[in-house]
Structures are given as C-alpha cells and as structure tokens.
Regions:
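Membrane-interfacial amphipathic/re-entrant helices at transmembrane-helix boundaries
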Residues: 1-23, 36, 50, 59-74
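Cytosolic-side transmembrane-helix boundaries in multi-pass membrane proteins
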Residues: 195-202, 207-209, 281-331
C-alpha cells in the first residue's frame, strides 16, 4: 500500500515534526499559565517572515560574503523579536484588557498571516522575481548544516545526525520546559496560576507577570518553528501561504500530548509522519484518499481527547482556568 523504507521516512517525519514541536512547546507553556492562545499559527507565520526579513537584508548588505555566525543569529533574533511582539499584543489584549481569549487568538492568527503575506509580497517585489517566492539559499545552508558523521555512519547518521541545529534546539527546549514545569519553584507557580489564578494571587504570586512571561516566551519558542520551516525544511524559500495548517497541528499536538512537553518530542515525529504519509501512496491514488490521510493527526487527537475525558484523571486534564480571564476584584 505504501512505497517507502523506514530509514528515509523517519528523517522526513522528524523534519516535518520539528515546527510542530516548537509550536506545541510554546503553546504548552502558554496554556499552563491559563492563557489559551489560538494565535499560534499566526505567531509561527510572523516568526518565519521576521527571520526572512532579517536574512534578506543581511544577504543584500553582505553581497554574498556571509559570516556564518551573523547569517544564523540575525534571522533568529528577528524571528524572536517578531514573535515576541505578537505575544505582547496577545497579552495586552487578554491579560490587561481582559478580552475574550478565543476571539483574540483567532484574530491574532488572521492578523499574523496577513502581516506575513504583506511583508513577504513586498520582499518579492523588491527582488523583481518572476516567481512568487524569496530564495535565501546561502543562509539556509548554515541552518541545514548537519552534525559530524551524518554521511559516514550509515543508518545511524541518517536517523540521528542528519538534521540542522534547530532540530536539536527544539528537543532541548522541550526537555527544558518539562523540567521547568515539574521540578522548579517558578514552574510550580506557573502551574498554580493556570489552575486557579485567584488562589495563586492570594498566595502572593504575581499572576499578571507569570501570564505575560509564559505567553511571551511561549510565543518566541513557537516563532522559531516558523523560522525552522523556512530556513531548514523549505531550504530557505519563502512563499506566501506555504505554511498550510502546521500551526493548527501544533495546537492539536498540545491536546494529544496532554500538556506534557517531553511527550511532544515523539508525538511531533508521529504527527509529522502522518502528515506526509499521503505522499507515499501509490501514484494512482485519488486526491480524496490523500486528503483523508492528511486528516489522521486531527482524528487521532480527537480520539485521545475523548479517551482523556472519559478517564477523568486530574493529571491528564487541561489547566482548570484555561481560557478564562482573571478579574482580581472578583477574588
């Protein structure tokens, strides 16, 4: 039914899953504070285009003589800045102004995609390109540089060493977020805010500070997912609306992993594999069948959500105050 070998399939699944890992880790941190940020797709989009803008103007200024360190750091810093601004905007609307989180998140996604398409289209016009895309192949080479031994250690190198550095950064961040949430006092305070902001406030925890920090840091992590997609997965090529539904997959991954960043590592690879499974179908397979296979991550997420709801185990539930604005005067 499928035509592929596992050694070549897994690296592709990993590369497809890394943006999801960045996005889900950032969203888990955000949701642990009680903020439901459905703007993650837009934030990832802004993170991607911000990195592209920084890289584009650096390549223009350097004139082809790129410094490896700057070629990496400028896009990363621009991506972090762009996604941070999106996170701050979301926090201002939902934490300070107490706007509805669901509506705000959806608006942020629409806004982020619009911003990305505007700047992406503007850069394409600057290049006078005949194709609707921006190619940053020179910068992409630095992001795609693999670990030593990737080409000389056979299947081991292909499975474990053949990825750009951001893939390993994503795994480290996920493990670090898991340790932070479960083994540190600030992590305990953050979870307390997400469970009951009024109780945390009564205990002397600064609810506003934790919500702002968790959401902004989570947004920056998610933004790196957009940068990875462009610079590594897409080989440095930006095309408007090329992200597809990866941002929504990252949100689905949060539910699938039951709000556990460490579980997201393997789950993102699973989702990545399911997402690209359709391309391994026989050539004659109908388009409708391929689209059904692309639905698998969402179907599995719904099944997990149903199972978790039926089990009713407290540790498997979302933060109790998720999506609820905190009104201190009602404490």
């Amino acid at each position: 039914m499928f035509d592929f070998d596992i050694v070549s399939f897994i690296p592709r699944a990993v590369m497809q899953g890394i943006p999801l890992l960045f996005g889900s880790t950032g969203e888990i941190l955000t949701e642990k504070s009680g903020n439901l940020n459905l703007g993650i797709p837009g934030i990832m989009y802004v993170g991607g285009i911000s990195g592209v803008i920084g890289s584009f103007f650096y390549e223009q200024a350097a004139g082809g003589q790129l410094n490896g360190f700057l070629a990496i750091m400028i896009p990363i810093l621009c991506s972090l800045l762009g996604s941070l601004l999106m996170g701050l905007l979301y926090c201002f609307l939902t934490v300070t102004l107490r706007a509805n989180q669901n509506v705000t998140g959806l608006a942020m996604t629409t806004f982020g995609v619009g911003v990305g398409n505007f700047f992406g289209g503007s850069l394409i016009k600057l290049t006078n390109s005949e194709v609707p895309s921006i190619a940053l192949a020179n910068t992409s080479l630095y992001f795609k540089t693999t670990l030593p031994g990737a080409d000389s250690t056979g299947w081991f190198g292909e499975l474990f060493l053949s990825y750009g550095f951001l893939a390993y950064v994503a795994i480290i961040i996920a493990l670090g977020a898991s340790y932070f949430l479960n083994h540190t006092r600030p992590g305990l305070h953050l979870r307390a805010v997400g469970e009951s902001a009024s109780t945390a406030d009564a205990a002397g925890i600064n609810v506003t500070k934790y919500k702002y920090l968790a959401t902004c840091i989570g947004s920056m992590i998610a933004g790196l997912g957009g940068l990875y997609y462009v610079m590594d997965y897409a080989n440095g090529v930006w095309s408007n609306n090329a992200f597809g539904d990866r941002g929504w997959l990252a949100i689905a991954l949060v539910i699938f992993t039951i709000w556990r960043p460490n579980v997201s590592i393997l789950a993102s690879i699973l989702f990545g594999g399911l997402y690209i499974l359709n391309i391994y179908l026989p050539t004659g397979a109908q388009m409708a069948v391929k689209e059904l296979y692309k639905m698998l991550p969402y179907v599995i997420t719904l099944i997990v959500l149903i199972i978790v709801s039926l089990r009713k185990k407290r540790e498997d539930q979302p933060p109790a105050s998720l999506g609820l604005s905190y009104f201190r005067e009602e404490r």
